[in-house]
């Protein structure tokens, strides 16, 4: 089924070699329903996309390791048309995480909040509070400012640095950056598994992983950018996002 889906998508989307990033005509040649031949890249000579035969779990694990091959498969060869559902899940997880962290913040200098935010009744009650909607809006603004900063960087590069550079469209770049922010989802299960005492450490680790995934995704989508340019672009986007949130929180 995975092969059939990728074969159908290869007619509609640009296929790239997961090893060198060069364009390819197709992922494989199908002779009949039971006989196929995996295509090799004309530039590097390797298999165009080895992940068409892999289990999704293996692809996910390689994506966790931030391997360029896995990221190219997901971003180019998997035929993802829209990531709005994942964006919504990402925002909801970030909203609940902020709400749980707020519920566990010390209420005074000597005592911590006695609200048991892990109780179902409290979760349902919190859903009707203004804080839930406030944190959702803040999470949306935070993500939007980051994507806006990356878009500005991309447009400035196209206009003033190298106008003839083959860079992706803003839509493709933003979709890839949203997908590469999946590390933020890990914060929620950490909180629910009773790691709220180390929430700050867990959040820092998730932010480091997300930042690294954003940089690696930028390098995959914009191969003409050096590591330094990709690093600065992602840093610019996150800095703009954090500065905006700090101003709104004052």
Identify the residue ranges that each predicted region occupies:
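Preference for well-ordered, secondary-structure-rich cores of eukaryotic proteins
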Residues: 18-19, 26-27, 31-37, 137, ...
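Hydrophobic alpha-helical transmembrane segments and adjacent short intramembrane/lumenal linkers
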Residues: 151-250
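Short hydrophobic/aromatic-rich motifs at helix boundaries and adjacent loops
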Residues: 39-44, 121-125, 185-190
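Selected alpha-helical membrane-embedding segments in polytopic membrane proteins
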Residues: 45, 52-170, 174
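N-terminal cysteine/histidine-rich coordination modules
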Residues: 1-74
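Generic structural hydrophobic/aromatic packing signal, biased to beta-strands
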Residues: 17-20, 41, 92, 149, ...
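Intrinsic disorder
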Residues: 11, 35, 61, 127, ...
């Amino acid at each position: 089924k995975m092969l059939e889906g990728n074969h159908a998508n290869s007619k509609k989307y640009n296929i790239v070699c997961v090893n060198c990033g060069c364009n390819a005509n197709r992922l494989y040649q199908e002779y009949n329903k039971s006989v196929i031949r995996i295509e090799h890249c004309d530039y590097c000579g390797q298999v165009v996309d080895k992940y068409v035969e892999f289990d999704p779990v293996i692809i996910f694990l390689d994506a966790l390791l931030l391997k360029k091959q896995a990221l190219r498969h997901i971003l180019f060869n998997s035929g993802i048309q829209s990531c709005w559902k994942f964006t919504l899940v990402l925002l909801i997880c970030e909203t609940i995480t902020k709400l749980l962290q707020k519920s566990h913040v010390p209420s005074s200098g000597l005592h911590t909040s006695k609200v048991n935010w892990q109780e179902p009744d409290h979760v349902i009650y919190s859903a009707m509070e203004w804080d839930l909607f406030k944190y959702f809006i803040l999470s949306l603004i935070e993500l939007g400012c980051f994507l806006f900063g990356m878009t500005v960087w991309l447009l400035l590069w196209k206009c003033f640095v190298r106008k003839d550079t083959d860079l992706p469209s803003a839509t493709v770049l933003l979709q890839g950056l949203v997908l590469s922010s999946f590390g933020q989802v890990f914060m929620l299960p950490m909180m629910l598994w009773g790691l709220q005492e180390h929430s700050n450490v867990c959040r820092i680790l998730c932010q480091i992983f997300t930042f690294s995934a954003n940089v690696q995704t930028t390098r995959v989508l914009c191969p003409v950018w050096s590591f330094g340019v990709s690093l600065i672009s992602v840093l610019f986007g996150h800095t703009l996002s954090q500065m905006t949130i700090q101003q709104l929180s004052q």
